[in-house]
A protein has these predicted regions:
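Topology signature of small-to-medium multi-pass alpha-helical membrane proteins
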Residues: 2-154
Length: 154
């Protein structure tokens, strides 16, 4: 398979600068996936939200759009200048989202806004798991980049 189109494998060996860079940029893809899921949820809240929640629709949608914009910008920053800080932040954010979703499922509450289809929760959960894996790979890649950079300086 052509390495240029191969997806990043978060648990692959980091044995070269190219592999480390590809893994670190995988974290940027995770932020962009996160932004896409956030925009999907914003659209669903706006168009399919429960009528009794209409007064909160604008704020909820705006909040989701702002967070999607933040995630897209973080992805751009991680793509241009891969570092270790953003994958750690992404890991923490993904773990928080997954734990909040898990707790709401355990207590029997709806993990999504009222009136949204059940499949949207599945898409968001799958997206968060994918983001978590890509951020793990991003952290490993950024650490490898730092290691290779310090080895080249010495």
């Amino acid at each position: 398979m052509n390495r240029r189109i191969a997806p990043p494998q978060p648990f692959a060996r980091v044995d070269s600068t190219e592999t480390a860079t590809a893994l670190a940029r995988g974290s940027a893809w995770a932020f962009w996936i996160w932004a896409a899921v956030g925009l999907m949820q914003a659209g669903l809240v706006w168009f399919l939200g429960a009528p009794e929640q209409a007064e909160f629709r604008g704020a909820t949608t705006g909040f989701a759009v702002v967070f999607s914009g933040v995630a897209a910008v973080l992805g751009l920053v991680q793509w241009r200048r891969p570092n270790r800080i953003l994958p750690v932040f992404g890991l923490a954010w993904a773990l928080y989202e997954l734990s909040a979703m898990s707790v709401s499922l355990m207590v029997g509450a709806s993990p999504a806004a009222p009136g949204l289809p059940v499949w949207s929760v599945g898409v968001a959960g799958a997206g968060m798991v994918l983001c978590l894996l890509l951020h793990i790979g991003g952290l490993r890649g950024a650490t490898g980049m730092a290691r290779f950079t310090s080895a080249n300086r010495a």
